[in-house]
């Protein structure tokens, strides 16, 4: 049953992504409402997929790459729905939904069988670690989209070619604020994710830090965002610099999440292609 809900939500995310892109092109408000409805129903179906997966498996269903990709996509869509309530940046869905859809399609190609839980994952700290880590990463996805929108808007304003996208994008100040707010929320969550992961590692392997490739790249990503926040607060990094760094930071997030799992050997072998 969980796989059915997963597939249904994937179809709805596809519809939402297409509708959001159509909203940018045709500038019709009803298309935006269609996109939001598809995303909302898809999120509900996705929630049911996670709940039924938990019931079927008997443990927190974020233990392999299929489940991790699905969970990451679910959080991103959830943040989009929250952002739709708290901000007026309706066009954000045109950038976030394709990310979630890509994650879902990647997950769709992976084995979906439920397997016995690896002993290392039988930890009190495991659910907290994954929740904090994925929440932080998803918020950085919002900052990534904000950075892309900032660069697009800045270029169109400089060239004085105000196209369909620019007409829907918020002001540069609003996008810069979105970037900063995402950073101030995402960085503490990433920090908590690393701390809970270290505590979990001590219980699982007897050491808080093992310099595993995943741990090393998590630290690199943390240092990147720490530098961004420091430069923002002390030097006043704003605008274009902040936008570019948010894009670079999220690419580091993706490499830490996917690249390390699939390319580099380490303790996180349970998160590989399986």
Q: Which sequence ranges carry the predicted segments?
A:
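Polytopic transmembrane helical bundles with strong interfacial aromatic enrichment
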Residues: 1-274
């Amino acid at each position: 049953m969980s796989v059915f809900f997963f597939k249904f939500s994937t179809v709805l995310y596809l519809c939402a992504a297409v509708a959001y892109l159509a909203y940018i092109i045709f500038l019709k408000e009803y298309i935006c409402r269609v996109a939001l409805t598809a995303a909302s129903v898809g999120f509900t179906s996705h929630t049911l997929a996670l709940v039924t997966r938990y019931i079927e498996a008997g443990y927190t269903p974020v233990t392999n790459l299929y489940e991790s990709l699905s969970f990451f996509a679910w959080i991103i869509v959830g943040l989009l729905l929250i952002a739709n309530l708290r901000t007026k940046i309706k066009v954000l869905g045109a950038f976030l939904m394709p990310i979630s859809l890509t994650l879902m399609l990647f997950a769709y190609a992976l084995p979906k069988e439920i397997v016995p839980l690896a002993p290392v994952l039988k930890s009190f700290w495991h659910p907290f670690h994954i929740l904090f880590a994925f929440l932080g990463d998803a918020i950085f996805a919002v900052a990534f989209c904000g950075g892309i929108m900032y660069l697009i808007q800045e270029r169109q304003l400089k060239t004085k070619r105000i196209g369909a996208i620019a007409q829907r994008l918020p002001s540069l100040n609003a996008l810069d604020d979105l970037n900063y707010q995402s950073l101030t929320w995402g960085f503490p969550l990433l920090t908590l994710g690393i701390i809970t992961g270290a505590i979990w590692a001590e219980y699982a392997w007897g050491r808080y830090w093992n310099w595993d490739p995943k741990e090393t790249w998590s630290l690199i990503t943390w240092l990147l965002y720490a530098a961004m926040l420091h430069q923002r607060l002390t030097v006043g990094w704003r605008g274009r610099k902040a936008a570019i760094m948010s894009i670079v930071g999220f690419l580091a997030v993706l490499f830490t999440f996917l690249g390390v799992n699939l390319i580099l050997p380490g303790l996180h072998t349970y998160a590989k292609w399986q």
